[in-house]
Amino acid sequence: MAGQAPTAVPGSVTGEVSRWQNLGPAQPAQKVAQPQNLVPDGHLEKALEGSDLLQKLGGFHIAIAFAHLAFGGYLISTVKNLHLVVLKCWYPLWGTVSFLVAGMAAMTTVTFPKTSLKVLCVIANVISLFCALAGFFVIAKDLFLEGPFPWPIWRPYPEPTTYIQRLELTLFCFTFLEIFLSGSTAITAYRMKRLQAEDKDDTPFVPDTPMELKGLSLGPPPSYKDVAQGHSSSDTGRALATSSGLLLASDSFHQALLHTGPRTLRK
């Protein structure tokens, strides 16, 4: 009885063993590179400086537009019989509109830095530049060429038309300033658009530190032969463990029988 070994052992004795156990040496952890990140450079600082400058230029545009509207409206309301080319062509009206649109386009470009808005800002400021040049020549014609006003402007005993002449001279100064503002704003918006295009094309890429995936293998799955060998080796281990337990139990039973045998014979 002690020499016999069981030939079949039920699987509920030692529990279910994993199929993937003992398939070979453990594979090292796989390293996976994370997505690449952009590296900031000097283009970002230049873009921020350009945005601040563009915002200030837009504010100056809007301020000059309202001042131009105030002085132009007062000039229209006071002039009655005096022939002025600047009023015949309604320059105070369309000049104010062009300056205001250019300033609002610059402020909108700073708030929403999109390529389409930057192009619109450049176009609006170029149109404002041509409007300012046209107004500059119109006012210069009234002040210096046709000569409806007495000269010089600043005289100790001004005539009734002198204050009108001074109002038009104020519009002339605003228009002269608007020429430089429109040109500067158009150039700044164009440079911002160019910097954004260079940023998209020339930004270097640096990969992040590889990330380790512990306990996971990215290699091919094991073959059917390896899985079958692992399963048979686990079944053999279970059978050996069970047979060892049965052998120990039979030995203990045999020893107990030997100890109790003489007692039974004495009785």
UniProtKB/Swiss-Prot annotation:
The keyword Ribosomal protein does not apply. GO terms for cellular component: membrane. It is a multi-pass membrane protein. Pfam families: CD20 (PF04103). Residues 78-83, 140-168 are extracellular. Expressed in thymus, kidney, colon, brain and testis. Expressed also by various hematopoietic and lymphoblastoid cell lines. Keywords: Membrane, Receptor, Transmembrane, Transmembrane helix. The keyword Transmembrane helix applies. It is found in: Membrane. Residues 1-56, 105-118, 190-267 are cytoplasmic. The chain crosses the membrane at residues 57-77, 84-104, 119-139, 169-189. May be involved in signal transduction as a component of a multimeric receptor complex. Belongs to the MS4A family. This is Membrane-spanning 4-domains subfamily A member 10. The gene is Ms4a10.
